Design a protein with these regions (language model features):
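Phosphate/nucleotide-binding beta-alpha loop and adjacent structural elements of enzyme active sites
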Residues: 1-218
Length: 218
């Protein structure tokens, strides 16, 4: 059962994706994409938004929180081109603890911060991009969207070069919540500059601690 608070924040997320079109800068990439990775898909809004612009792309949807995953399944189950994974992308495959923000599940994380101060533990499955790509025999990923609540550094700063080479366009919600994460962002930013000829930064309208990073080879 979805609480009133959860419903409120889900409506806000829906508004950001469909009305404000927070990911407007990905439209051209999505239109021509054959494979899209929605890494932390929450209840499925970004995947639905992608489907609005591309009816044929194969979408890999990742959501670790069981309640959110089940809600997404109710919406996306009849689309046979969306592959649903009840996993969190990490730098190693394991079963571990997620710090769940019950009201705003999209602000849950492996780590604690002001975004999830009153977390409760939930055991979830973690898996690497390398394992997903290998087990599904994927040679190229046209669009990767990552919003994994300041675990982006743990994943991307440890990502194998073979996987970097398969990503054509990458959109990351970057969380610079402290000095250590700022240092991690500097490392990741240098990697993005070396991998992709086109890079752009969009500042969050809500806080200077969060930004959207867009990188593409096209």
């Amino acid at each position: 059962m979805i609480s009133d608070k959860q419903l409120k924040y889900q409506k806000a997320l829906y508004y950001e994706i469909f009305n404000k079109e927070e990911y407007w800068f990905l439209k051209e990439d999505i239109l021509s994409a054959k494979i899209i990775f929605d890494i932390w898909g929450h209840v499925g809004y970004f995947s639905e938004w992608c489907r609005k612009y591309n009816k044929d792309a194969e979408i890999y949807f990742f959501e670790p929180v069981k309640s959110s995953f089940n809600q997404a399944k109710e919406t996306l189950w009849n689309d046979d081109k969306i592959k649903l994974f009840n996993y969190w992308i990490s730098n190693k495959s394991e079963k571990s603890t997620l710090l769940l923000n019950q009201d705003k599940s999209m602000q849950s994380s492996k780590f604690s911060s002001f975004l999830n101060p009153n977390w409760i533990p939930e055991k979830v499955n973690f898996i690497t991009l390398k394992e997903i790509v290998g087990s599904n025999h994927i040679n190229s990923i046209d669009v990767v969207k990552i919003d994994i609540e300041w675990m982006e550094f743990e994943v991307l700063n440890n990502l194998e070069q073979t996987i970097w080479g398969k990503i054509n366009t990458l959109a990351i919600e970057v969380h610079i919540l402290n000095d250590e994460l700022e240092n991690q962002w500097k490392i990741l930013s240098q990697k993005l500059q070396s991998e992709f000829p086109k890079n752009n930064i969009i500042q969050s309208p809500y806080t200077d601690k969060i930004l959207l990073s867009y990188s593409t080879r096209t």
